[in-house]
Amino acid sequence: MPFGDNYIMSPINRRRCSRVSPVECLQLTWSKCELLVLEFKPRMSFSHTQIVLYPKNTCCHSFKHYLSHQTLSSLKSVESCIRMGNLTCMPSSNSRERSRLRTIVSSIVYTQAVAPISTPTFKVPNQAQMSSPIWIRTETPSNGDNFRSMDDLLEAVNNQRMMLTPKRLTAAVSQKLLM
């Protein structure tokens, strides 16, 4: 399953949400409770979502031990927490605020659910590829002046490939001296 393991946690028990996507987990939790905490891995990782569930009237401070010190120190408000994408909590005090936050969290979880699992990879060319140009652009004036023939272009490419390094320069000088 592409989403990895999902967990529903409560202070009393912890059970695995088997074969359920984060979106389905979110729908499942709202029928049971009014306080929901979603804790994601780093922003670029779409392979794992943890859902931490608490019953009604549970104070936010009671789940401090589940959160890292870094998350707690950066947590200033519910909205900043949502923007970070690391932690999302929904207080049950105000129904209007709760429904607005529910919409935001639904979109976050949906994004996590449909996002591609691949991570971008960057291929760095080796030094030999970087030193030799693949394409040389030449301009041809309308009157034909300064036109470079194909032989000139090939010679320029070969000359660039044969750039003298200190070692090659020493060898070339010693060879010329021996002649």
Curated annotation (Swiss-Prot):
Q: Which UniProt keywords apply?
A: Host-virus interaction, Inhibition of host innate immune response by virus, Suppressor of RNA silencing, Viral immunoevasion
| GO annotation, biological process | symbiont-mediated suppression of host innate immune response
Domain of life of the organism encoding this protein? Viruses
Q: Which Pfam families match?
A: Gemini_C4
Give the InterPro entries listed for this entry: Gemini_C4
Query: Is this entry keyworded Transport?
Result: no
Family per record: Belongs to the geminiviridae protein AC4/C4 family.
Purpose: Pathogenicity determinant. May act as a suppressor of RNA-mediated gene silencing, also known as post-transcriptional gene silencing (PTGS), a mechanism of plant viral defense that limits the accumulation of viral RNAs.
Protein name stated in the entry:
Protein AC4
- Organism classification, top ranks? Viruses, Monodnaviria, Shotokuvirae, Cressdnaviricota, Repensiviricetes
